[in-house]
């Protein structure tokens, strides 16, 4: 009995819900019935005749004023829509329609059934979006003196923006300074040098820091006992001063490498000394952390110098040793430098081994990780891939894996293919990048374009398949396929990171919504009608009357019906009816 009662209540509840769904139709017919019953007391016929009389007495000036007012309102709507679209990237009318009107009209979001699951991951999604909008240090950044400045001397253009250089200054202050720097004169000078905006002032401060160490040694050595002379001789010079000179004063990579080797000697001594004292207090621990950052930075830049000078195997060995010695320092992303060097050696098995370690779901992705994985998958099938053959026989398993890897990479950063396919010109990469943005695409393609060209057919496979990614993610700002939705903040940050002479890639490409185009057309059409009616009222009246007569004529209706039937016959391929033949006896 209880089950029967429960079933009856469920049926009654469903009937009530169904009746409320179609209740508006009942109300509509009730209103029509009431209007019909009350047509005599409400004097509807008299009111209609009064309205028709009023419309007949209107002059052309009224219609001119009406069309002018409508065009003015349409123009204001157009201006507001354009401003809203430029600021927020979406149409105001479309947003209101989707967000507010569709639920009132009974529209249901496709993801409403998954609200419980999505609500649990809101915090993870927010954290992911914040991390994707974070600006990262470019692991493959160039040398200012030996590369960026040479570009400026040749072209007269500044490849780095003030925002990018300011971020680098903040990084240098974070990595190369600590609270105890004021106790050592050379480090105190370098602490101020990293905050200098003028490059010449920074270089002068670095030279001053090195000179202070020389003067200090010459003055103090004769004044102390012989037992302490050995300790002062072991006192290292200022490693950060050599770093600054190697980065900004050296005009060639060879000069930068020499300065970095001097910095390595100084930095290694500081690191060993602070390593022994790191447990003596928080001050010594901070100093050891700073010396560790300095040593890792120097070794990484030395490996990059060897890579630039053609000693790729030596660079690979230095990077592997550095990753083994300091496995927890992932902030420098040394594995991306290692991947690029291994690709230059065409050591694809070693590249796959590095990817197996770093292409993990728990680790942050990058364009280097995703596109290198796609390159390895494409390398297995690209030499024999043909779009015509694939369309006839279908994709094999290996080809499907390669296409899926390309789609995954394009979803992560959709700007890269245009640079790899040379559909857009490259510029020097910035010192900082935004993941999934145009800056990261430039940094990746600048160093990896040669590796894609070296693999036969890889660019052809990329050209044939990369645009298919966008069919899987029609609304990339709202929902992704393998990654989180594409962050909206990339365009603004990329414009600050990239120079003004570069046209920043925007994804998804902003197209004018239909509402803006419709409003613009309506505004222009009504304004033109108002102008013609004002200038030629009699002629426009004759034209309007003629158009009304044409549309209301029987010939127009017959012609319209015939054209409709002809279209239906063409679409259905209906053969024409055979003509009857008359025989005479």
Swiss-Prot record:
Pfam families, sorted: ST7
Annotated membrane topology is:
Multi-pass membrane protein
Question: Disulfide pairs?
Answer: none
**Main localization of the protein described in the UniProt heading:** membrane
Q: Which residues are glycosylated?
A: 47
Subcellular location as annotated: Membrane
Q: InterPro entries under this entry?
A: ST7
What are the Phosphoserine sites (modified residues) in this protein? Answer: 386
Superkingdom assignment? Eukaryota
Provide this UniProt record's keywords sorted from A to Z. Answer: Glycoprotein, Membrane, Phosphoprotein, Transmembrane, Transmembrane helix
Name residues in a coiled coil: none
Looking up CDD domains in the UniProt record yields: ST7
Which GO terms of the cellular component aspect does the record hold? Answer: membrane
Task: Locate the transmembrane regions by residue number.
Answer: 15-35, 62-82, 512-532
Q: Which family does it belong to?
A: Belongs to the ST7 family.
* UniProt xrefs under PANTHER family: SUPPRESSION OF TUMORIGENICITY 7, SUPPRESSOR OF TUMORIGENICITY 7 PROTEIN
Identification of the protein by name: Suppressor of tumorigenicity 7 protein
Origin species: Loxodonta africana
């Amino acid at each position: 009995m209880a089950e029967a009662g429960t079933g009856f209540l469920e049926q009654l509840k469903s009937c009530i819900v169904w009746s409320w769904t179609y209740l508006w139709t009942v109300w509509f017919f009730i209103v029509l019935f009431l209007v019909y019953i009350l047509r005599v007391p409400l004097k509807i016929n008299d009111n209609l005749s009064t309205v028709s009389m009023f419309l007949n007495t209107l002059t052309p000036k009224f219609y001119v004023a009406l069309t002018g007012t409508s065009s003015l309102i349409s123009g204001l709507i157009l201006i507001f829509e354009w401003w809203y679209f430029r600021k927020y990237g979406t149409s105001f009318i479309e947003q209101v329609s989707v967000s507010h009107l569709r639920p009132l009209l009974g529209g249901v979001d496709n993801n409403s059934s998954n609200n419980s699951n999505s609500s649990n991951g809101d915090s993870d999604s927010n954290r992911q979006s914040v991390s994707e909008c974070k600006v990262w240090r470019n692991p493959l950044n160039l040398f200012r003196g030996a590369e960026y400045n040479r570009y400026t001397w040749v072209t007269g253009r500044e490849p780095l923006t003030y925002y990018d250089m300011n971020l680098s200054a903040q990084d240098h202050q974070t990595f190369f300074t600590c609270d105890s720097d004021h106790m050592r004169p050379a480090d105190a000078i370098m602490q101020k040098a990293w905050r200098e905006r003028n490059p010449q002032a920074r270089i002068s401060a670095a030279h001053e820091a090195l000179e202070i160490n020389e003067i200090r040694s010459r003055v103090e050595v004769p004044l102390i006992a012989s037992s302490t002379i050995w300790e002062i001789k072991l006192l290292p010079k200022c490693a950060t001063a050599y770093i600054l000179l190697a980065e900004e004063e050296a005009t060639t990579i060879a000069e930068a490498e020499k300065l970095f080797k001097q910095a390595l000697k100084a930095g290694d001594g500081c690191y060993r000394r602070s390593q022994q004292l790191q447990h003596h207090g928080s001050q010594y621990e901070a100093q050891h952390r700073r010396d560790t950052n300095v040593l890792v930075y120097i070794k990484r830049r030395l490996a990059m110098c060897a890579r630039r000078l053609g000693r790729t195997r030596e660079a690979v060995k230095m990077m592997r040793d550095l990753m083994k010695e300091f496995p927890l320092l992932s902030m420098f992303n040394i594995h991306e430098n290692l991947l690029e060097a291994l690709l230059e050696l065409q050591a694809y098995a070693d590249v796959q081994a590095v990817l197996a370690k770093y292409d993990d779901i728990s680790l942050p992705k990058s364009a280097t990780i995703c596109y290198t994985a796609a390159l390895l998958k494409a390398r297995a099938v690209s030499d024999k891939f043909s779009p015509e053959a694939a369309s006839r026989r279908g994709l094999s398993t290996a080809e499907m894996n390669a296409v899926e890897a390309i789609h995954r990479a394009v979803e992560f950063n959709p700007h890269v293919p245009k640079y790899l396919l040379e559909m857009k010109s490259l510029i020097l990469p910035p010192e900082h990048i935004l993941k999934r943005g145009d800056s990261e695409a430039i940094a990746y393609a600048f160093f990896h374009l040669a590796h894609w060209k070296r693999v036969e057919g890889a660019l052809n496979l990329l050209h044939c398949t990369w645009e298919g990614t966008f069919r899987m993610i029609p609304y990339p700002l709202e929902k992704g396929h393998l990654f989180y939705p594409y962050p909206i903040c990339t365009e603004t940050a990329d414009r600050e990171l990239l120079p003004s002479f570069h046209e920043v890639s925007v994804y998804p490409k902003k197209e004018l919504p239909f509402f803006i185009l419709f409003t613009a057309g309506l505004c222009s059409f009504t304004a033109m009608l108002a102008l013609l009616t004002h200038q030629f009222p009699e002629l426009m009246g004759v034209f309007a009357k003629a158009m009304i007569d044409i549309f209301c004529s029987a010939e127009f209706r017959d012609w319209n019906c015939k054209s409709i039937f002809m279209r239906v016959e063409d679409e259905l391929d209906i053969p024409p009816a055979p003509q009857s033949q008359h025989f005479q006896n």
